[in-house]
Regions:
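A structural motif corresponding to the C-terminal lobe/cap of the Radical SAM core domain
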Residues: 3-8, 12-203
Length: 209
């Protein structure tokens, strides 16, 4: 799922072939740390329409230890500015509900997204896919059963975590965009909208109006 996990030489050869044989606008997905000015310039010349980028989590230590992504938040922010410089539209994909995550750790994902000038951003629920280390961790810690299946990234969490309940995960997920886009002095109001109650739903509807 990382289009730029290839050498610069191969990208240049692919770009020449693409412009010669296909020459249509396209979308691709990669990670922020694969971006360079040279690579984005090549993609722009190829006719890129937009990009999707996996940020996944905003806490630097959690991202390194749990996701094995040893890249600083500062570098991620700076790398994404390259897309803004070349006027390439992009979306940032985030995940909530990882094993061992807390609400405060998840708020770091919101904080880093507030520093990124993406034209769209998404938050998905963690999915413990078969064959992944995080699924093994979830099973070892008793957060899921061995036969647990996930049907969709948009499905509610299947993890049972006392420190970060399914309701709390779902509430933060639905309020992700308001937290990123609205002023911080409205955060107390947004927090109320995390609750799936009559009051919370009413506030949520007013935020999205």
């Amino acid at each position: 799922d990382t289009f730029l996990a290839l050498s610069d030489k191969y990208l240049e050869e692919f770009a020449d072939m693409y412009k010669s044989d296909i020459n249509l606008p396209f979308w691709c997905q990669t990670r922020p740390e694969t971006l360079t000015e040279e690579r984005v310039s090549i993609l722009k010349d190829m006719g890129i329409h937009r990009m999707g980028l996996g940020l996944e989590h905003g806490n630097e230590e959690f991202r390194a230890t749990m996701l094995d992504r040893k890249v600083s938040s500062k570098k991620i922010i700076e790398d994404l500015k390259i897309l803004n410089h070349f006027d390439v539209k992009y979306s940032v994909n985030n995940i909530v509900g990882f094993p061992n995550e807390t609400r405060e750790l998840a708020m770091d994902t919101i904080r880093i997204n507030r520093q990124i000038n993406a034209d769209t951003r998404n938050m998905y629920t963690f999915s413990p896919f078969h064959g992944t280390p995080l699924r093994d961790i979830a099973i070892q810690q008793g957060l899921i059963e061995k036969d647990t299946l996930v049907k969709s990234l948009s499905s509610p969490t299947v993890l049972d975590m006392p420190q970060f309940s399914a309701s709390a995960i779902g509430g933060l997920k639905r309020c992700f965009v308001p937290y990123v886009l609205l002023e911080k002095d409205r955060w107390p109001e947004i927090k109320k909208a995390e609750s799936f109650t009559e009051e919370g739903n009413t506030i949520w509807e007013s935020l999205m109006a």
